[in-house]
Amino acid sequence: MESLEVANGKSSALGVSREASSPPQMGFFIAQVVLRFFTLAFTGAAIAVMVTAKETVEVFSISFTVRYSYLSAFKFLVGADAVVCGFSMLSLIFVSIFNKGKSNHYFFLYFHDLILMVLSMSACAAATAVGYVGRYGQDKAAWMAVCGNVKMFCDKALASILLSLIGFICLFLLTIMAARNLRVSGHLI
């Protein structure tokens, strides 16, 4: 009987299941660590790029300076990226320390990743909308495109938004992985 349980991946003599260290579980752990690190790196880079986005132009001998902090959507993006970056660092530490494969950890990780994903998605959407109007204008509302005058600022803002979107995609993948593990473990939400 004991040999049958060992062949099935369980060891009753030790009272320990080998399923927690099986290759699929280890693959999940590695993918999770890599995606959390990428989320941390991309949102950190997005913050750095957006905060340094500044340009001064002269119109009719009057000097104007454009900064990310003048636009509420860009401030929201930086704030959301800071929250996502910080909590990604904490979750990376949490996952590394508490890698036990317990299903209740999957639920907390799922919930954590879901909240961060929604926050990131809303900030990216707001910044993308403002960036689109800045680049192309809105003729029917008589809003002029301004990126022709502040090209460097607009390019940096675009780069920051793209980096934030990559961070969002990493969070989306983490959410799917955590939901899948909840389902596989039999602890559906």
Curated annotation (Swiss-Prot):
<comment type="similarity">
    <text>Belongs to the Casparian strip membrane proteins (CASP) family.</text>
</comment>
<dbReference type="InterPro" id="IPR006459">
    <property type="entry name" value="CASP/CASPL"/>
</dbReference>
<keyword id="KW-0472">Membrane</keyword>
<keyword id="KW-1003">Cell membrane</keyword>
<protein>
    <recommendedName>
        <fullName>CASP-like protein 1F2</fullName>
    </recommendedName>
</protein>
<feature type="transmembrane region" description="Helical">
    <location>
        <begin position="78"/>
        <end position="98"/>
    </location>
</feature>
<dbReference type="InterPro" id="IPR044173">
    <property type="entry name" value="CASPL"/>
</dbReference>
<comment type="subunit">
    <text>Homodimer and heterodimers.</text>
</comment>
<feature type="transmembrane region" description="Helical">
    <location>
        <begin position="28"/>
        <end position="48"/>
    </location>
</feature>
<dbReference type="GO" id="GO:0005886">
    <property type="term" value="C:plasma membrane"/>
</dbReference>
<feature type="topological domain" description="Cytoplasmic">
    <location>
        <begin position="178"/>
        <end position="189"/>
    </location>
</feature>
<dbReference type="Pfam" id="PF04535">
    <property type="entry name" value="CASP_dom"/>
</dbReference>
<keyword id="KW-1133">Transmembrane helix</keyword>
<feature type="topological domain" description="Cytoplasmic">
    <location>
        <begin position="1"/>
        <end position="27"/>
    </location>
</feature>
<feature type="topological domain" description="Extracellular">
    <location>
        <begin position="135"/>
        <end position="156"/>
    </location>
</feature>
<feature type="topological domain" description="Cytoplasmic">
    <location>
        <begin position="99"/>
        <end position="113"/>
    </location>
</feature>
<feature type="topological domain" description="Extracellular">
    <location>
        <begin position="49"/>
        <end position="77"/>
    </location>
</feature>
<keyword id="KW-0812">Transmembrane</keyword>
<feature type="transmembrane region" description="Helical">
    <location>
        <begin position="114"/>
        <end position="134"/>
    </location>
</feature>
<dbReference type="InterPro" id="IPR006702">
    <property type="entry name" value="CASP_dom"/>
</dbReference>
<feature type="transmembrane region" description="Helical">
    <location>
        <begin position="157"/>
        <end position="177"/>
    </location>
</feature>
